[in-house]
From Swiss-Prot:
PANTHER family per record: RING ZINC FINGER-CONTAINING PROTEIN, SI:CH211-59O9.10
Bias type Basic and acidic residues, positions: 98-110
Enzyme class (EC, first level): transferase
A molecular function (GO) term: ubiquitin protein ligase activity
EC number: 2.3.2.27
Tissue note: Expressed at extremely low levels in normal breast, prostate, lung, colon. Higher levels of expression are detected in heart, skeletal muscle, testis as well as in breast and prostate cancer cells.
Protein name as annotated: E3 ubiquitin-protein ligase RNF115
Compositionally biased residues, Polar residues: 279-296
Pathway this chain belongs to: Protein modification; protein ubiquitination
Zinc finger (RING-type): 228-269
The species this protein was found in: Homo sapiens (Human)
Post-translational note: Phosphorylated by AKT1, allowing association with the 14-3-3 chaperones that facilitates associating with TLRs. RING-type zinc finger-dependent and E2-dependent autoubiquitination.
Coiled-coil stretches: none
């Protein structure tokens, strides 16, 4: 019996001699035994510190291709408080705040959701580039994880719990409609510009352009300060200009290239037929907006 006690004491001393690092608290801790959980945040996301642990010193970097390492990297990219808002005391980056909030709320919330022990994450070596305070957040990885959690929490609620998980309370719409990072935002803007391209009035008919009357500028018009609306140059007496059906005057070299692209007056937006092209443009833009919305719903959000 005495020998067993001595052996247990030696084992405890050996464990105590080991150093452990908590990835939630971002510091060394002495884990609670035998569960191996952090005494500050009550999480199991800790690992043993070795001489080559990359998160404690500077130098090169190493990569571990094990499954547990991949999960640890994904978990590190994830903004935990976005999903577990009721567990902010346990996921806060400040150990003092964690201790204070945990004392105020007690362990009732903790035990209601997870039982007597907190959720344990797979323990494995976790490496990232040394000299960096935290890993770079990947929009693609974060989007995938949020989709996974969206499906997991969609219909989950703990009976009798005052805080059932609800994805609708975390985001204001479908997570797939969000732009994850700068890349996602650029893709949306590019698609929107593509939908709105060529939504203005179509080119004017060439016969109508050539049939526009050519008139000469009078002294009265010069005295009124009449100018070309395109180049803003003042007209001179007896200068030849082109007159549109809306009675606006332009230099031929200014208005013809415009009409070859848009059947509309640059001043009043009326077409050569005398119709108001503003309403046509609005209806075309609305149609393009609806097309963009439908395409967004059918877009494969897992392509990156």
């Amino acid at each position: 019996m005495a020998e067993a006690s001595a052996a247990g004491a030696d084992s405890g001393a050996a464990v105590a001699a080991h150093r452990f690092f908590c990835h939630f608290c971002k510091g060394e801790v002495s884990p609670k035994l035998p569960e191996y959980i952090c005494p500050r945040c009550e999480s199991g996301f800790i690992e043993e510190v070795t001489d080559d642990s990359s998160f404690l010193g500077g130098g090169g970097s190493r990569i571990d291709n094990t499954t547990t390492t991949h999960f640890a990297e994904l978990w590190g990219h994830l903004d935990h408080t976005m999903f577990f808002q009721d567990f902010r005391p346990f996921l806060s980056s400040s150990p003092l705040d964690q201790d204070n909030r945990a004392n105020e709320r007690g362990h009732q919330t903790h035990t209601d959701f997870w039982g007597a022990r907190p959720p344990r994450l797979p323990l494995g070596r976790r490496y990232r580039s040394r000299g960096s305070s935290r890993p770079d957040r990947s929009p693609a990885i974060e989007g995938i994880l949020q989709h996974i959690f969206a499906g997991f929490f969609a219909n989950s609620a703990i009976p009798g719990s005052p805080h059932p998980f609800s994805w609708s309370g975390m985001l204001h719409s479908n997570p797939g409609d969000y732009a994850w990072g700068q890349t996602g935002l650029d893709a949306i803007v590019t698609q929107l510009l593509g939908q709105l391209e060529n939504t203005g009035p179509p080119p004017a008919d060439k016969e109508k352009i050539t049939s526009l009357p050519t008139v000469t500028v009078t002294q009265e018009q010069v005295d009124m300060g009449l100018e070309c609306p395109v180049c803003k140059e003042d007209y001179t007496v007896e200068e030849e200009v082109r007159q549109l059906p809306c009675n606006h005057f332009f230099h031929s070299s200014c208005i013809v290239p415009w009409l070859e692209l848009h059947d509309t007056c640059p001043v009043c937006r009326k077409s050569l037929n005398g119709e108001d092209s503003t309403r046509q443009s609005q209806s075309t833009e609305a149609s393009a907006s609806n097309r963009f919305s439908n395409d967004s719903q059918l877009h494969d959000r897992w392509t990156f």
